[in-house]
Amino acid sequence: MSFFNRLFQKERPKEIPTMPPWEEIVEMMYDKCLDAFTAEVVRVVYSIDNTMRYVVLRYEQGLYTYQLEAIYKLDEDEWRYALSHNDDALPAMWESIGCAVGKSLFDSEEELLKEMKEEPEYKKYFE
């Protein structure tokens, strides 16, 4: 009879840990998800509070571009769903800000950095 009990016994739902505080999430996300890019990551520049970053990429052709990203914190439902499918899920993710289509390409990293430092977001959050 114990065989049938084990066979039809419902699994207890696993306990979902509480969402970590924002400061811990920011620390946890530092240098995460950089392997998702198809181009080579050359440099990562973080904002003063580490909640945003510019990712500088180099393509095989030798051209450079960059992408601005910010931390997106999952809400409670998203957090529960993520943990129900993956025990190693993070409570946040890096999300691209702005349109990835039509990004400028640069011949050198120096030229790219000069242009990047002129952006309003850079002046507001990175200096």
Residue ranges and their predicted role:
Residues 3-52:
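Negatively charged, low-complexity tracts enriched in Asp/Glu with abundant Ser/Thr
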Residues 112-127:
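Low-complexity intrinsically disordered segments
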Residues 56-89:
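A short, structured beta-strand/loop element
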Residues 78-111:
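A short, exposed loop/beta-hairpin motif centered on an aromatic-Gly-Thr core
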Residues 44-48, 59, 100:
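Compositionally biased, intrinsically disordered low-complexity segments
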Residues 7, 71-72, 77-79, 103, ...:
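A structural signal for the main folded, soluble domain(s) of proteins
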